[in-house]
């Protein structure tokens, strides 16, 4: 089936995917996607704007249609041109073309924490917190203070005595109910 089969068909009724299949069949060779689109546009007499609007769907159709096969680098062919077993061999794998060292050099990650310059720009993780020195100086003083105090620092709260003698607060304003008061309330009902 090629473009000759469409001579009696209204071109407005043809889909881009059908025309692309016929073009590849007539050519009998692989084609770049851009060339396929240009040939389809010429055959269907579509404007650039109309092709641009339909291009995403057309590309999706080529990917999902089982009659087409991507050869890599946006080059397309018909699946019927290849034996089933040969399909994997015909697909171009760009990662297999070069040696592995060049691929690794290309994908080498940069460690931003390794600095090659000397000076203030280099981060010293062993001595990065200026407060560490202050804490170590304070801890020596705290040890000396601990020797002077024989008791626990936590039990030296002087505010404990104030808990028993509360000032006139809300507690004094609350009334307390006795069991007799509860019995009186039940009798009234």
Curated annotation (Swiss-Prot):
Biased composition, class Acidic residues, residue ranges: 90-100, 118-189
Gene3D superfamilies noted in UniProt: RNA polymerase, subunit delta, N-terminal domain
PROSITE patterns: HTH_HARE
Domain of life: Bacteria
GO cellular component, one term: DNA-directed RNA polymerase complex
Gene Ontology biological-process annotations: DNA-templated transcription; regulation of DNA-templated transcription
UniProtKB keywords: DNA-directed RNA polymerase, Nucleotidyltransferase, Transcription, Transferase
Molecular function in Gene Ontology: DNA-directed RNA polymerase activity
Domain HTH HARE-type: from-to ranges: 14-81
Summary of the function given for this chain in its UniProt record: Participates in both the initiation and recycling phases of transcription. In the presence of the delta subunit, RNAP displays an increased specificity of transcription, a decreased affinity for nucleic acids, and an increased efficiency of RNA synthesis because of enhanced recycling.
Protein family according to the UniProt entry: Belongs to the RpoE family.
Name of protein: Probable DNA-directed RNA polymerase subunit delta
Source species of the chain: Lactobacillus delbrueckii subsp. bulgaricus (strain ATCC BAA-365 / Lb-18)
């Amino acid at each position: 089936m090629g473009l000759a089969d469409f001579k009696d068909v209204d071109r407005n009724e043809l889909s881009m995917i059908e025309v692309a299949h016929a073009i590849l069949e007539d050519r009998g060779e692989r084609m770049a996607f851009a060339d396929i689109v240009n040939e389809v546009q010429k055959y269907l007499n579509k404007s650039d704007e109309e092709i641009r609007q339909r291009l995403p769907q057309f590309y999706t159709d080529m990917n999902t249609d089982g009659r087409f096969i991507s050869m890599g680098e946006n080059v397309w062919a018909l699946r019927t041109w290849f034996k089933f077993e040969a399909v994997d061999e015909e697909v171009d794998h760009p990662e297999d073309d070069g040696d592995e060292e060049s691929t690794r050099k290309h994908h080498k990650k940069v460690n931003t924490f390794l600095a090659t310059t000397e000076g203030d720009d280099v981060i010293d993780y062993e001595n990065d917190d200026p407060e560490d020195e202050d804490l170590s100086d304070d801890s020596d003083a705290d040890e000396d203070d601990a020797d002077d105090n024989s008791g626990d620092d936590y039990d030296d709260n002087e505010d404990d005595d104030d808990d028993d003698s509360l000032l006139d607060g809300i507690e004094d304003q609350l009334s307390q109910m006795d069991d007799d008061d509860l019995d009186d309330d039940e009798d009234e009902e």
